A protein has these predicted regions:
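C-terminal structural segment of proteins
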Residues: 1-126
Length: 126
């Protein structure tokens, strides 16, 4: 978006039976906004991840995709080794801000926990 523009609506196509997505958020509600958040979208066919999209907020100056963690997942069966590697790739790619709401290490840790939980969720991996 350009300065002065705002997002009015978002439309999503219907998920296929092979697709799963989730969004996790950590917030300090006294202040009214999220400290960090993670969106995950996977396509899994025959037990392997054929497509992964991971986006974070609070992991850098702006919301961002984490392509290094996506690359760990794509082409792999999501098991313990792959989850640990994807979380490590995500944390290495982040440059979170440090401010009065949360420091950088806290945000980096929290986003890694969010990815770990999302990848282990039965709703995500059915």
């Amino acid at each position: 978006l350009k300065p002065g523009e705002f997002l009015q609506a978002v439309a999503f196509k219907r998920q296929l039976s092979t697709e799963r997505s989730t969004f996790l958020e950590l917030g300090n509600r006294r202040h009214g906004f999220a400290v960090a958040g993670l969106a995950l979208r996977l396509e899994i066919e025959d037990g392997s991840c054929t497509m992964a999209r991971i986006a974070t907020m609070g992991g850098g100056a702006v919301a961002q995709r984490i392509s290094s963690a996506e690359a760990v997942l794509e082409g792999a069966a999501i098991d313990e080794t792959v989850i640990v590697a994807a979380v490590a790739a995500l944390r290495a790619a982040l440059d979170p801000p440090h401010d009065v709401h949360a420091d950088a290490d806290y945000r980096r840790h929290a986003l890694g926990v969010m990815l770990d939980r999302a990848l282990r969720s039965k709703e995500t991996l059915w």
